[in-house]
UniProtKB/Swiss-Prot annotation:
Temperature and activity: Optimum temperature is 25 degrees Celsius.
Marked site positions, Transition state stabilizer: 488
CDD domains assigned to the protein according to its UniProt record, in alphabetical order: AmyAc_bac_euk_BE, E_set_GBE_euk_N
GO molecular function: 1,4-alpha-glucan branching enzyme activity; cation binding; glycogenin glucosyltransferase activity; hydrolase activity, hydrolyzing O-glycosyl compounds
Cell compartments where the protein resides: Cytoplasm
Gene Ontology CC: cytoplasm; fungal biofilm matrix
The organism of origin for this protein: Candida glabrata (strain ATCC 2001 / BCRC 20586 / JCM 3761 / NBRC 0622 / NRRL Y-65 / CBS 138) (Yeast)
Enzyme class, broadest EC rank: transferase
EC number: 2.4.1.18
pH-dependent activity: Optimum pH is 7.
Protein name: 1,4-alpha-glucan-branching enzyme
Length: 706
């Protein structure tokens, strides 16, 4: 294929996927928009000098909002509010006086500012952790009170305050006398060479007790578990401040504030620093796809207008049709400043190592992936046709800039993940090739497949070819995070894999004091096999939601009116793993063995596996990846002796992982000391074969001895 007629800025993408050639001009236009914005940002300085994207983002979070100068003891506050006529800083520091601290009149861009000199005794004019708001006078003369848009601390009101004034969150001036000092270097991560295994976690539910757990409890109690399991990254959910706990963190009100339910900003810094000391990366589940409709404690109607940060409500683009939330106007320069600064802030101030971008499908399309527009078939016209795709070019351009920024800030450790169900081509190709710049996308079809199998098919009817196709159906050159279940499957109304497999028997039959029932025996065996085949065949990275590694027995339901504000299901029962008399520890130890086996033998971040066998009658799947041989026998009753498995490289093979070990809840039917010698005869299109014993519902991983 000749690239001479392909626009230079997307030649890399087309060389990776020649099917993109008819759409090269569209791809080029989309990249050009992001590059134009980048040019505008670099030249948006008062003196006309050039600034980097990193400088732009850092200067923004260091300029806007409230900032205390530790040397001069001055406090400077800046706020962009173009619709407001006047602005006043009010709070406990001035007894909520509406007149005493008027901000300087907005400049030509709509920015108000005020500088507060220190008190006569040399203290800051605003005490640390005291309540604060900004009051705007609108064009019609009315007044509105808002939490500053760039606030770094917001808290729930006391019961007495809530009863009197409502549950609106309270902004606070965070300026601790002794801020946390990071002690440990970030772990390095090289996308080209390193594997990544991600533990998805929610701080508030990370306790067996029915309560909101804390950052400190997570640091002390959960981080050591994650380290033991062998995960090398944590993805923290529901960190950005959200007034409604039951929203799972997806209705963000205060973008620069971390959730105060779990503790202080210094507590979160300690958590991340401790994770780094263990060699664990920490990723933030970042919500830039939408925002809460709250106005008094959120961004909505912040300066009295409906279109400051968001598309106008009259435009048809200002609200999400399903989420009851506001949608950002990514084409606005000030919105770009706000969101890009938000990313830089979390990287610099909290030392996050990257982001999982939530709701990317909703961002990418004007139809938000809802209704007929969300029925993606894989036809390239659905993504790249000028007439049919419905792509939001501005949102895509913002995501490109976001990836540029994160990788510029963290050249040795950045990780960006897109939650995209649509399969948008080039999303996870490098920006230099004309792609979106993400490192990974979530393989969202995989959990759907497993749930559908368990809901609708008997074990004898499992289609091996369909399983393999779904696990390997991903775009060449674009990495995916494989997972068989995440927080989505744990939510009330759905079931975890363990619950689909064992249901109510998990409450009565998980004891080791009696022989496992048929239901429990099947459930434990398939739970391990599903996780291992997803891990080894489904992608270039792996993700697990907290508790699912040991088959957490219950769904996740946050306290709300519908459940009488109960915390009973808003917790993770780690006590089940610690009980030696329960079989949950078997699943937990298998998960640890699987993660640590991958760390030692490295199969995730390697080329796609070669699948040599998908036997529908025997229910056997075999494949090779990075020199390792994986064999799965999904047959419910049939074990096979001297079963021939094709293998490309001759030599002696030994088992390095076996799901049937007793400590993993298995039956110890396999002799792991045995060596397997290849026979120099072609089998299943491989140059050699070995013969193995594979019991029913068992998987083994073999590695050639060097």
């Amino acid at each position: 294929m000749s690239l001479t007629k392909i626009p230079e800025n997307v030649q890399g993408a087309v060389s990776i996927d020649p099917w993109l050639e008819p759409f090269a001009d569209v791809l080029s236009e989309r990249r050009y928009l992001a590059d134009k914005w980048l040019y505008d940002i670099k030249h948006a300085t008062p003196d006309g000098s050039e600034q980097s994207l990193v400088d732009f983002a850092r200067n923004a979070y260091k300029t806007y909002g409230l900032h205390a100068n530790q040397q001069t003891k001055e406090i400077v506050y800046r706020e962009w509010a173009p619709n407001a006529q006047r602005a006043f800083l009010v709070g406990e520091f001035n007894n909520w006086n509406e007149e005493s601290h008027e901000m300087k009149h907005k400049d030509e861009f709509g920015v108000f500012s005020i500088t507060l000199a220190p008190l006569e005794n040399g203290d800051f004019a605003i005490p640390h952790d005291s309540k604060i708001k900004v009051m705007f006078v609108l064009p019609d003369g009315s007044k509105v009170y808002r939490i500053p848009a760039w606030i770094t601390r917001a808290t729930q009101p006391s019961k007495e305050t809530a009863q009197k004034y409502g549950p609106t969150y309270e902004g606070r001036f965070w300026n601790p006398p002794n801020s946390y000092q990071f002690k440990h270097q970030r772990p390095k991560f090289n996308l080209a060479n390193d594997s990544i295994k991600i533990y998805e976690a929610h701080i508030g539910i990370s306790s067996p007790e029915p309560k909101v757990a804390s950052y400190k409890e997570f640091t002390q109690n959960v981080l050591p578990r994650i380290k033991h399991l062998g995960y090398d990254a944590i993805q923290l959910m529901a960190i950005m401040e959200h007034a409604y706990y039951a929203s799972f963190g997806y209705q963000v009100t205060n973008f620069f504030a971390i959730s105060s339910r779990y503790g202080t900003p210094e507590d979160l810094k300690e958590l991340i620093d401790t994770a780094h000391s263990m060699g664990i990366l920490v990723l933030l589940d970042v919500i830039h796809s939408h925002a809460s409709k709250n106005s008094e404690d959120g961004l909505n109607m912040f300066d009295g207008s409906d279109h400051q940060y968001f598309h106008s409500l009259t435009s048809g683009r200002g609200e999400h049709p399903l989420w009851d939330s506001r949608l950002f106007n990514y084409g606005s320069f000030e919105v770009q400043r706000f969101l890009l600064a938000n990313l830089a802030y979390y990287i610099d101030v909290y030392q996050f190592d990257g982001f999982r971008f939530d709701g990317v499908t909703s961002m990418l399309y004007l139809h938000h992936g809802v209704g007929a527009g969300g029925a993606f078939s894989g036809d390239y016209n659905e993504y790249l046709s000028r007439d049919r795709s419905g792509v939001d070019h501005e949102a895509l351009a913002y995501l490109m800039l976001a990836n540029d920024l994160v990788h510029d800030l963290l050249p040795e450790s950045a990780v960006t993940i897109a939650e995209d169900v649509s399969g948008y081509p080039t999303l996870c190709l490098p920006r230099t090739a004309g792609g979106g710049g993400f490192d990974y996308r979530l393989a969202m079809a995989l959990p759907d497949m497993w749930i559908k199998l368990l809901k609708t098919k008997q074990d004898d009817d499992w289609d091996m070819g369909h399983i393999v196709h779904t696990l390997t159906n991903r775009r060449h050159g674009e990495k995916v995070v494989a997972y068989c279940e995440s927080h989505d499957q744990a939510l009330v109304g759905d079931k975890t894999l363990a619950f689909w497999l064992m249901d109510a028997a998990m409450y009565t039959d998980m004891t080791v004091l009696k022989e496992p029932t048929l239901v429990i025996d099947r459930g434990i065996a398939l739970h391990k096999m599903i996780r291992l085949i997803t891990h080894s065949l489904g992608g270039e990275a792996y993700l697990n939601f907290e508790g699912n590694e040991f088959g957490h027995p219950e769904w996740l339901d946050f306290p709300r009116v519908g459940n009488n504000d109960s915390y009973h299901y808003a917790r993770r029962q780690f006590n089940l793993v610690d009980d030696d008399l329960l079989r949950y520890r078997h699943l937990n130890e298998f998960d640890a063995a699987m993660q640590n086996c991958e760390s030692k033998h490295q199969w995730l971040n390697t080329p796609q596996a070669y699948v040599s066998l998908k036997h529908e009658v025997d229910k056997v799947i075999a494949f090779e990846r990075n020199g390792h041989l994986f064999v799965f026998n999904f047959h419910p009753t049939q074990s096979f002796t001297d079963y021939r498995i094709g293998v490309d490289v001759a030599g002696t093979y030994k088992i390095v992982l076996n799901t049937d070990r007793a400590e993993f809840g298995g039956h110890n039917r396999i002799d792991e000391a045995q060596e397997f010698f290849t026979t120099d005869l072609e089998w299943n299109n491989r140059r050699n074969f070995i013969q193995v014993y594979i019991p029913s519902r068992t998987a083994i991983v073999l590695t050639r001895q060097m």
